[in-house]
Amino acid sequence: MKKPVIVPFGTMRKGKVVKLNDQRLTCQPKKPYAEVLFFGDLHLGHPTCLLEKAKENLDYCLNNRIHVLLMGDLIECGITGSVGDSVYTQKLNPQEQLEDTVELLSPLAQAGLILGLHGGNHEDRVFKTTGINVAKMMAGTLGVPYLHQACWNIFRVGKQSYTVYSMHGASGSRFIYTKLKAATDISHYFRADVIAHAHVHDVAAHTIERQSINKRMKKIVYEKHYVVLTGHYLGYQLSYAQMKGMPPSHVGSPKLQFFSDRHDIHSST
């Protein structure tokens, strides 16, 4: 990947909106695969944000040359009129959240490891009330592709290419099986090697096996597809989830390995 140019925060630079995010990934040293961490729902500024755990994962990616796809809701962005009480309880105001998030992600962007940045419904709060797209501003400042709230991706690893449909999502599912069902339903309409779905604050990877016919070889073949829930970084105690009686969920981000010597994907959650 070409390394982006980081501009000082406050310098206006138009974020580049892409419809097809075509990226060449670098394999791990002496390994036949490239790795991608799907990182989202940080909610920086929220009183229960587990920022240190997020920093650990991002530092690990930086030190080990792991690519990162940003899945939205990176900032809490509590504003007047938004759902919930975070406009009163957030630890930083939205401007500080925006600046701290750019500072947090700049080393990865400078290293050319950020594949793209999605907006989420929390960033979208500002757009709905002012027309200012803070997610696009973050992408422009970092010099990475802005993927809106959903985007097709092609990840090229060696001679292999993988299709990934990534999105922030909008499901109100409460339990892991209903969260996975909501993401799996999307796979019925988007034929991709990976469906990556954020927003539901859980980490999971589900494999779908499908049959199809290879017309050239005249035989039945099996295809493996992944549905991935891309995690979060919010503690449970005194959280919205606890207040609503939702079960505690796994904190963190899933990591996928995309192989270069065969068409295969492994997951680590």
Predicted regions and their residues:
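Core catalytic region of metal-dependent phosphoesterases/phosphodiesterases
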Residues: 29-147
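A generic local structural motif
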Residues: 23-25, 55-56, 103, 152, ...
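Charged, low-complexity C-terminal accessory regions
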Residues: 114, 118, 124-206
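Short, flexible loop/turn elements at secondary-structure junctions
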Residues: 40-46, 157, 168-171, 231
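Beta-strand-turn-beta hairpins that frame and shape the catalytic cleft
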Residues: 26-36, 152-165, 222-225
